[in-house]
């Protein structure tokens, strides 16, 4: 893509010193060493990964940001990727700048992964104009396979058990989040990592 179409950029994330093995691999999976430019032409190959972007370290062209209406006014999670989806659909490109680096990683347990992926599923369900045609399940399966191959390669096969449980919690959270409209309010409050957001929005629903 020509420079004139690059209207959003995000940096490479490097793991912290205390980062666990699987999370360290995930950083490398999502933030490789090579820079890239992504636009609508990449959708057949990359699918939902075309819209991948992180506000942990990102920059935006202000005029395009205002043209597209900026971030959605109210979302539980994933505002950066939702904006990126609208950007790509508008004919612009996203730059992944691997030379720009920031140290950022998590050591989430299974339950934290569940809550986080529930919120991810909700955000995608609320924006079918972006995510219905490009579901995340395929990319998730690809990451699990790559992670399994990696832990075997480094001779730590016992981490396959951790990977199995983490992946299961992630998927169940995501699955429920995508179907949040069918869940009782109490279940939603338990599943989410942002109870305050739901207290406000559930009250609006019931007015």
What are these regions (language model features)?
Residues 2-24:
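Conserved donor NDP-sugar-binding/catalytic core segment of glycosyltransferases
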Residues 12, 28-50:
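Short, flexible, basic/aromatic active-site loop/helix in glycosyltransferases
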């Amino acid at each position: 893509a020509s420079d004139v179409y690059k209207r959003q950029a995000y940096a490479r994330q490097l793991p912290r010193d205390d980062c666990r093995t699987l999370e360290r691999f995930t950083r490398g999976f999502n933030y490789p060493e090579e820079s890239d430019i992504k636009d609508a032409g990449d959708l057949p190959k990359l699918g939902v990964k075309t819209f991948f972007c992180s506000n942990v370290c990102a920059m935006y062209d202000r005029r395009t940001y205002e043209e597209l209406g900026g971030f959605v006014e109210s979302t539980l999670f994933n505002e950066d990727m939702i904006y990126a989806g609208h950007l790509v659909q508008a004919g612009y490109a996203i730059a992944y700048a691997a030379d720009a680096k920031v140290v950022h990683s998590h050591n989430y347990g299974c339950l934290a992964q569940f809550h986080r992926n529930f919120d991810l599923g909700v955000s995608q369900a609320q924006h079918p104009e972006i995510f219905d045609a490009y579901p995340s399940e395929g990319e998730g399966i690809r990451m699990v396979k790559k992670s399994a191959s990696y832990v075997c390669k480094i001779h730590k096969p016992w981490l396959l058990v951790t990977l199995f449980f983490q992946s299961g919690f992630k998927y169940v959270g995501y699955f429920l989040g995508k179907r949040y409209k069918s869940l009782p309010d109490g279940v939603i409050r338990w599943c989410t990592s942002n109870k305050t957001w739901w207290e406000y929005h559930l009250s609006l629903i019931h007015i």
